[in-house]
């Protein structure tokens, strides 16, 4: 793996490399290294339209191998042919053209051996994997900067400096500029000539742009980074997405002729290809499904260097089983599906877009750093490759995902650490993904290496082959730490994670190697409210050292510690034997918030939390009542500024409130009383249906679930008090619905149990959306606001617990609120 220091040194040396190339000129043009670029320039016709009228290619031959390479027009009467020799030795060439002054030109050149840092192009290996042409392993850790080459020169240089010290060895970016949210700047250069009146001539490439583009590909190559070139996309205001079929084909062939000789080039036919066909709002394109097939066939047949070929999806997935697709380039957040995607496509699978780390309102751009890191682990453990992106708000809209610049997030350093972990393991192509699509993640070379990942805290088992004991290491992806956990005997071994997001590494002891001591912990109690005093005991005689996870430590055994603040604390015990060997173990202590205090208190005359902002037609009534009139343009209530942290990860919760519908007419799927899903997943959604029943969805879109109250509980023109509880610690009857009788005035009324339902999808996920009352939040506004609750809401409260079932209140507790 190329180090960041080495990358930076290479980048700083680029100027001198370019300078020496210019000085040596003809000498360098006459020779090349294996997998480098050899180029010849020819003088030809200037008159007419060379791009449309002149055909040029050359046949390169060596030892009976013949390769036909297309040429291209570079402006000012200059024609070029570029070739990347796949083998060292003497190569001969002869040009072919429909113009006599370009036809029959020939000669020879010598390709030398590849330089030490030139491993050749990346290619598919053993069905599911990637490697360099010289056999060097290549484990893709990608990132995305869609429009970085369309920014100022200063910003492009800053992006290169950032990449030089990053963990990324592939970057996805577009040939054409992008017109989209946070992307409104006008580039200096375009792929085609811009006429005086502002229109583009799609039959006349601009050589200045292409020379600039090539330089950026070479800049990346010197940093050891693959350039995944996106040829089309639907985010366009200049017309590039709507070129004619002949113009599209000529453009593609021009890209092949100019760019395929660079060994770090990959082809991505499109970003969200299907959005150029069905054209959702603010998307452009005139492509049909047959067009994408044709483009792939052109690449497959006419790219003389056989670069990798993929296509990125929006909602519709391309058929990646087709033989002209070399790898499956996916946009999906289904990280559990990796093993299945490999089996389905029988090709390398790359999660090129699994959402981005950031803080923008859009659901695709607000992963936490921990979630971005976790997705890299989940994809890797499934035998797949993963891509990164970053979308933190910036006063000048310089978001890495599109414009580059600098990285602000916390996931890149952890992605680097994962890359180091994998570099220390057997080669990726030797590791089998032995997990499934149900939450089991195991990567193994049986008998030699096992890496078991636990995204949650459920116990998991692994069957260790052979007759030697194994060293067990506790691997913490977020803390970037690998700790000696102890010893596992061959056979079935069960891990019991102290917290979520941990991995366990198993490697056999060498013959004669001393076994580690055992670290065993007992702790009581393990959960409660602050101040919580816990007694810890090490169950071995070895010297004990405790780290309580809140900055406090102890060398006593037993040890007692008091936790003063709510939180989840990972307590670590390290034991050291007389021979100096050590091992660790961990236990998690859950110190819960006071569940008697509401997380949300809304639609009150005073004492609300968090602060509420009325949006659209939403307004206040007497005593803080929220009024949501029936009819366009609709309204909603914003609760707080961004995601409410205390709603993340709730294992149990209670929602209490009073509602008075003015109408039970609904938008598609039902009207929202409260909504904190992140688009269509992760969070809580409480929905009103036209027959007066409510539905609760957790972490999923509600349309296909059946977790409902009885019908007829809400009545038009009447106030009804309700309470719904959810308890993920219970296997059955974990949801309880309570309602009062409908009444004319908004007074406190006793509720009674309506029904119990079994609906358990686990705790509320961590990557929730912001809370909205009475309608969708910002992550779903693009789908319309007619899902507004049509009426009034009063005294709405949410209580919850991350640690236990205490957040699901009893009927008696509800009656006190």
Role assignments for model-derived ranges:
Residues 216, 227, 717-728, 737:
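Short tryptophan-centered beta-strand motifs in secreted/extracellular beta-sheet-rich domains
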Residues 30-32, 49-50, 136, 358-360, ...:
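Aromatic- and carboxylate-lined catalytic core of secreted/periplasmic carbohydrate-active enzymes
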Residues 696-721:
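Short, aromatic/His-centered strand-loop micro-motif at the edge of beta-sheets
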């Amino acid at each position: 793996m190329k180090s960041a220091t080495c990358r930076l040194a290479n980048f700083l040396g680029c100027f001198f490399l370019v300078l020496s190339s210019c000085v040596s000129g003809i000498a360098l043009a006459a020779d090349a290294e294996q997998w480098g670029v050899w180029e010849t320039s020819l003088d030809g016709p200037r008159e007419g339209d060379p791009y449309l009228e002149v055909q040029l290619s050359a046949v390169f031959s060596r030892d009976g191998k013949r390769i036909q390479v297309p040429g291209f027009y570079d402006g000012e009467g200059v024609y070029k042919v570029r070739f990347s020799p796949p083998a060292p030795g003497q190569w001969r060439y002869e040009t072919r053209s429909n113009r006599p002054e370009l036809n029959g030109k020939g000669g020879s050149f010598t390709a030398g051996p590849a330089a030490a840092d030139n491993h050749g192009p990346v290619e598919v290996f053993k069905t599911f994997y990637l490697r360099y042409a010289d056999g060097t392993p290549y484990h893709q850790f990608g990132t995305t900067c869609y429009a970085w080459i369309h920014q100022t020169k200063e910003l492009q240089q800053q992006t290169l400096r950032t990449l030089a010290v990053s963990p990324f060895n592939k970057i996805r970016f577009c040939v054409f500029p992008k017109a989209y949210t946070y992307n409104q700047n006008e580039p200096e250069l375009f792929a085609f000539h811009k006429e005086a009146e502002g229109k583009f001539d799609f039959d006349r490439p601009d050589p200045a742009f292409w020379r600039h583009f090539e330089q950026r590909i070479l800049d990346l190559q010197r940093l050891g980074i693959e350039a995944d070139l996106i040829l089309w996309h639907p985010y366009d205001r200049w017309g590039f997405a709507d070129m004619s079929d002949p113009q599209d084909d000529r453009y593609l062939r021009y890209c092949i002729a100019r760019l395929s000789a660079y060994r770090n080039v990959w082809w991505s036919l499109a970003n969200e290809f299907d959005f150029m066909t069905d054209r959702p709002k603010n998307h452009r394109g005139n492509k049909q499904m047959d067009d994408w097939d044709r483009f792939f066939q052109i690449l497959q047949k006419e790219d003389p260097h056989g670069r990798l070929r993929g296509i990125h999806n929006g909602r519709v997935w391309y058929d990646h089983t087709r033989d002209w697709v070399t790898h499956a380039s996916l946009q999906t957040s289904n990280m559990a599906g990796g093993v299945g995607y490999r089996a389905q496509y029988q090709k390398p699978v790359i999660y090129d877009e699994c959402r981005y780390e950031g803080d923008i309102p859009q659901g695709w751009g607000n992963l936490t750093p921990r979630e971005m890191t976790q997705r890299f682990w989940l994809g890797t453990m499934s035998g797949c490759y993963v891509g990164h992106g970053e979308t933190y708000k910036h006063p000048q809209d310089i978001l890495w995902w599109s414009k580059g610049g600098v990285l602000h997030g916390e996931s890149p350093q952890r992605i680097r650490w994962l890359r180091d972990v994998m570099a220390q393991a057997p080669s990726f192509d030797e590791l089998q993904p032995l997990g499934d699509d149900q939450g089991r993640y195991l990567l193994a070379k049986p008998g030699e290496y096992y890496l078991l990942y636990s995204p949650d805290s459920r116990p998991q088992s692994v069957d260790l082959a052979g007759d030697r004991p194994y060293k067990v290491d506790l691997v913490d992806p977020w803390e970037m730490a690998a700790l000696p956990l102890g010893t596992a005997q061959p056979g079935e071994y069960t891990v019991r994670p102290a917290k979520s997001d941990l991995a366990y590494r198993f490697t056999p002891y060498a013959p004669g190697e001393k076994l580690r001591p055992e670290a065993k912990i007992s702790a009581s109690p393990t959960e409660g409210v602050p101040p919580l005093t816990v007694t810890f005991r090490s169950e071995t005689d070895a010297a004990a050292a405790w780290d309580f996870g809140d900055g406090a430590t102890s060398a006593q055994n037993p040890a007692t510690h008091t936790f003063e603040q709510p939180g989840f604390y990972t307590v670590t015990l390290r034991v050291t034997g007389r021979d100096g060997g050590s091992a660790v173990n961990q236990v998690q202590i859950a110190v819960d918030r006071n569940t008697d205090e509401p997380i949300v208190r809304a639609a009150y005359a005073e004492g609300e939390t968090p602060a509420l902002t009325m949006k659209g037609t939403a307004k206040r009534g007497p005593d803080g009542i929220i009024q949501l009139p029936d009819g366009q343009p609709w309204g909603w209530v914003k609760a707080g500024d961004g995601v409410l942290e205390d709603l993340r990860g709730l294992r149990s919760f209670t929602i209490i409130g009073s509602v008075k519908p003015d109408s039970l007419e609904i938008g598609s799927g039902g009207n929202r009383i409260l909504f904190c899903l992140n688009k269509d997943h992760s969070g809580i959604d409480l929905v009103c249906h036209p027959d007066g029943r409510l539905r609760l969805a957790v972490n999923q879109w509600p349309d296909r679930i059946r977790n409902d109250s009885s019908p007829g509980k809400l009545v038009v023109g009447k106030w009804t008090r309700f309470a719904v509880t959810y308890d993920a610690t219970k296997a059955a009857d974990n949801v309880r619905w309570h309602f009062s009788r409908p009444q004319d005035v908004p007074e406190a009324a006793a509720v009674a149990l309506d029904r119990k339902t079994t609906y358990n999808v686990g705790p509320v996920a961590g990557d929730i959306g912001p809370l909205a009352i009475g309608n969708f939040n910002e992550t779903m506004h693009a789908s319309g606001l007619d899902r507004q609750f049509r009426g009034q809401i009063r005294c709405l409260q949410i209580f919850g617990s991350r640690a236990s079932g205490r957040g699901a209140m009893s009927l008696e507790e509800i009656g006190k609120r």
